[in-house]
A protein has these predicted regions:
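Cysteine endopeptidase catalytic domains of the caspase/legumain-like
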Residues: 1-144
Length: 144
């Protein structure tokens, strides 16, 4: 099915251009196979995307939640109605990540919830990657 792949892929350079053109703080949720930023030592990164994220973060802040490392598949199950990552994000915003019980979802608590939940759903075969620096202001109000 690779003949159809270019229609579904978004090159890192295109994402980088889009990110650099945005105003204000931003949060991104990327649920695709091999979606990670690969911030771990020894792993390759997309230099354009990494540069764009660093530039945005210096100026106004950015948070990126990616469903898996750059070397992993993002798992799906028909019973979930989504991938494991999207399922965990939805559950987290609906209250699973409201650890303080104050109605606010923060990047740090969403990261913790999503990572644990995805690892549980995928039997530790998928590890989300979260890129954020110094931002822990609420990003959502708990949904009902």
């Amino acid at each position: 099915k690779l003949k159809n792949a270019p229609k579904r892929w978004v090159p890192g350079e295109e994402i980088a251009r889009t990110l650099l053109g945005l105003k204000g703080r931003s949060a991104f949720f990327i649920d695709t196979c091999h979606s990670g930023i690969n911030a771990r030592p020894g792993q390759s990164t997309n230099p354009d995307l990494t540069k764009a994220l660093n530039e945005i973060n210096e100026e106004r802040g950015v948070i990126v939640f990616a469903s898996s490392t750059g070397k992993e598949l993002s798992q799906e199950d028909p019973a979930w109605g989504n991938g494991a990552f999207t399922k965990a994000i939805i559950e987290g915003i609906r209250g699973g990540a409201d650890f303080r019980k104050d109605g606010l979802i923060r990047p740090s608590t969403l990261q913790s919830y999503v990572t644990d939940r995805v690892m549980e759903l995928t039997k530790k075969e998928q590890r989300p990657v979260i890129f954020t620096v110094g931002i822990d202001e609420p990003i959502a109000v708990r949904g009902q």
